[in-house]
Amino acid sequence: PMESRIRHLLSSQKVETQSIVEKACKQANLAVREYLRDETALKISHPGRRQTVPFQVVDGLPRSLEQRLEQLPEDIFLFLMQSRHLLNQGHSALQLLDKNLHQVLQAFEAEDSGEKIGLNKSLKLIENVLDKINLIKLPELILNINEDVMGAYFYKIPGIQIYWMPIGLIAGALDITVDDLSFIVLAHELAHAYTHLGLDIDKIQWQTEMFANTNLMIVEGLAQFYTEGICKKLEPNNPKLLKAFYKLLDHQPPPYTHFREWADKHASEVVRFTLIATRSNNILKYDQFLNIMNDIEEKILHVDGVLPSEE
């Protein structure tokens, strides 16, 4: 079965992918929760109410993903796509040698007895392999499935599952680290938990039925907004994290990407007020959400305009 083949692929590396995902999520957990509490001003628990949203790193592939991967012509394609970063590195190294071959041979006192031909053949082979795997478009193949393939927030339980196998595949295909992708997936799912269950100052949260029926552009957009936010906050210490977020974003469907249309136009406080208003007023439609956000922006600008300056 496909699951066992992928397990073998991801476990044959120096450090098992599952262990990397587990460690990355464990290290990220508290920092992400603290960020979400600060940015949303929402609390999962308070003195009179104990609420937990645990996460688990789990085995397995969603059936829809398994069916997509079974369409690949050969297992070797999966291996090569997951190892794209190594192919890119090899291609760059061969190009470097090719451009400086004469000096390299002189430095090592070697004769050019076919090295140029061998290099050209190797370069051509890697280029052909990269062309072939680029045609398959593994990230789109996985990420355009209308199902949570790397992680899921189960709002009725509540709890989070992180799927290490798809994370390993997508990280390799996008040439980003498993650590960074694990962080991003956990942050996204925890953002769902905080926007849903987090209590505001009036001890109000998003009604579960309303949360479940709200347009995905709202629910996923808010989760993406706060995921991008923590990646930006950590950029000075880990610049690769934000780059990984944007690499992933390039391959995701509209519910995960459309937040960029409003994220850069509105301050985080405007988004926070919009989140609270959406929950309190049972807003389900995306156009209503956008209208609320624009109204809040105008009110804040109006208030700022009439307040006396602090001189």
Which residues does each PLM region occupy?
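Fold-level signature of zinc-dependent metallopeptidase catalytic domains
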Residues: 2-24
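Active-site scaffold of zinc-dependent metalloenzymes
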Residues: 75-181, 190, 196-202
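Post-HEXXH active-site segment of zinc metalloproteases
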Residues: 180, 195-224
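A conserved beta-strand element that flanks and buttresses the S-adenosyl-L-methionine
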Residues: 186
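Hydrophobic/aromatic-lined pockets within catalytic cores
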Residues: 191, 195-199, 227-235, 263-267
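Post-HExxH zinc-binding segment in Zn-dependent metallohydrolases
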Residues: 210-244
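Pan-zinc metallopeptidase signature
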Residues: 245-311
